[in-house]
Amino acid sequence: MKLLHIKFFTAILFSAALFSSCDKLETDPVGVPELENYYYAGFFSIPWNNTATASVLRNQTALIKFPVKFHSSYLRDYDPSAQYALITTGITNPAVVGQDFEVVDKSGNKITSSNGIYALVFPKAETKIDTLYFKVLNNQLPGTRRIEINLVTNTTQQYTVGTFSQAFKRFIEIR
């Protein structure tokens, strides 16, 4: 009988703890003032991680494409931009912009950076998928070259475009 009381009491305590620890969390940023002008951009491709590599031949004529998804809960009267940088730190034999490849638009026209930062604009902060384009320049130097492309946080007075921890980095390997 005493064992039955202990089991019953334990069950009541467990149930009370279970129900009292439940808390409704609001995960949708809509209506949270500090997040109303905060957006996210991430590479939109499989795998959803930071290891994806486009491995191409140096004489490839087709543009290299990396789709980027912009996440927003609102339409705005301004045009936020996701920013990206080309990283060579820690890369042996890095690819060189202007020598091994160029950053281009979808028509193949060269895009210039501002202090090493490139921008991908999302008009009216509308959720959509756009693309980063790269053109291989057929450099005849021997060896495989590699470059890292990182989406970086862009903070202005009007908005912030952040990145995801698992979808902000891609690589190009030119063979």
Model-derived features: positions:
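Beta-strand-rich interaction surfaces with strong enrichment in secreted/lumenal proteins
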Residues: 53-55, 117-123, 137
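Sec-dependent bacterial lipoprotein signal peptides
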Residues: 1-22
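Bacterial Sec-dependent N-terminal signal peptides
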Residues: 16-46, 164-171, 175
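Short, exposed beta-strand-loop hairpins at the edges of beta-sheets
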Residues: 156-163
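Contiguous beta-strand segments of beta-sheet-rich domains
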Residues: 78-91, 101, 130-155
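Short, solvent-exposed loop/turn segments enriched in Ser/Thr/Gly
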Residues: 60-66, 128-132, 143-147, 167-168
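Short proline/glycine- and polar residue-rich coil/turn motifs
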Residues: 109-114, 120-128
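Beta-sheet-dominated interaction scaffolds and their linkers
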Residues: 32-72
